[in-house]
């Protein structure tokens, strides 16, 4: 069984890598954003608790997020293992996750960090733009529409760039994220779970390196 956390700054390629890992290893992809939406829609006890904070514009406390993660990891669909997306973000959350995986007897097997130079990340993120009509995401470096100037999904010709994808904003976002990411890497390094992979490579080569690490668990 593979129970995995994928770490990396925005633009490091976690989304693409996650899809490939899920396809090959049949892991359950667990996103905290999706969990919150699902729990609130289903009006579960933890979902309602989280909603009470969100409705007031407050951050959801770590303990509530951890309860939600534990609820999700307890579900029967996690047979082959899981890949966690968006949790933990801090060492406090990592400690809480430790407790959860021990209680559920589903220990983490791997923590993989995708390392990409800041300049590359800024280039990647500030190349992103979106369809004004349907929100489809494109990238000037890696994912242009099939027909230039026409959205693949809805056929619209209007595009825009989000404020937080502009270079100066991207730089600030990366600095904030790195402050959170570095202690997490140290935390898992000390536990002997961390593997660092060069995220500057092609998506195919990145997955090849991840695959080499994960195949040792089978």
Curated annotation (Swiss-Prot):
Region of interest (NMP), residue spans: 31-60
Binding site for Zn(2+): 131, 134, 151, 154
Binding locations of AMP: 32, 37, 58-60, 86-89, 93, 162, 173
Pathway this chain belongs to: Purine metabolism; AMP biosynthesis via salvage pathway; AMP from ADP: step 1/1
Listed PANTHER family: NUCLEOTIDE KINASE (PTHR23359)
One GO MF term: adenylate kinase activity
Annotated source species: Lactobacillus helveticus (strain DPC 4571)
Enzyme class at the top of the EC tree: transferase
Comment field on protein domains: Consists of three domains, a large central CORE domain and two small peripheral domains, NMPbind and LID, which undergo movements during catalysis. The LID domain closes over the site of phosphoryl transfer upon ATP binding. Assembling and dissambling the active center during each catalytic cycle provides an effective means to prevent ATP hydrolysis. Some bacteria have evolved a zinc-coordinating structure that stabilizes the LID domain.
Entry similarity comment: Belongs to the adenylate kinase family.
Residue numbers spanned by region LID: 127-165
GO biological process: AMP salvage
Subunit relationships: Monomer.
Name of the protein in question: Adenylate kinase
Subcellular location: Cytoplasm
Main location: cytoplasm
Catalyzed chemical reaction(s): AMP + ATP = 2 ADP
EC number: 2.7.4.3
Superkingdom per UniProt: Bacteria
InterPro entries: Adenyl_kin_sub, Adenylat/UMP-CMP_kin, Adenylat_kinase_CS, Adenylate_kinase_lid-dom, P-loop_NTPase
The entry's keywords: ATP-binding, Cytoplasm, Kinase, Metal-binding, Nucleotide biosynthesis, Nucleotide-binding, Transferase, Zinc
Residue numbers binding ATP: 11-16, 128, 137-138, 201
GO cellular component assignments: cytoplasm
């Amino acid at each position: 069984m593979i129970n995995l956390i994928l770490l990396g700054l925005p633009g490091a390629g976690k989304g693409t890598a996650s899809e490939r890992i899920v396809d090959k290893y049949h892991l359950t992809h667990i996103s905290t954003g999706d969990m919150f939406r699902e729990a609130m829609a289903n009006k579960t006890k933890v979902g309602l608790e989280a909603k009470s904070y969100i409705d007031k514009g407050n951050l959801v406390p770590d303990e509530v997020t951890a309860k939600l993660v534990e609820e999700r990891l307890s579900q029967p669909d996690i047979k082959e293992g899981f890949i966690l997306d968006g949790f933990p973000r801090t060492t406090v959350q990592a400690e809480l996750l430790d407790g959860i995986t021990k209680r559920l007897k589903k220990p983490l097997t791997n923590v993989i960090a995708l390392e990409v130079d800041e300049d590359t990340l800024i280039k990647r993120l500030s190349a992103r733009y979106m369809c004004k009509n349907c929100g489809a995401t494109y990238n000037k470096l890696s994912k242009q529409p099939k027909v230039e100037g026409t959205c693949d999904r809805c056929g619209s010709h209007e595009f825009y760039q989000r404020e937080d994808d502009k270079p100066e904003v991207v730089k600030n976002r990366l600095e904030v994220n790195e402050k959170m990411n570095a202690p997490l890497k140290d935390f898992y390094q000390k536990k002997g779970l961390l593997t660092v992979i060069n995220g500057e490579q092609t998506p195919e080569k990145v997955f090849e390196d991840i695959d080499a690490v994960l195949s040792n668990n089978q």
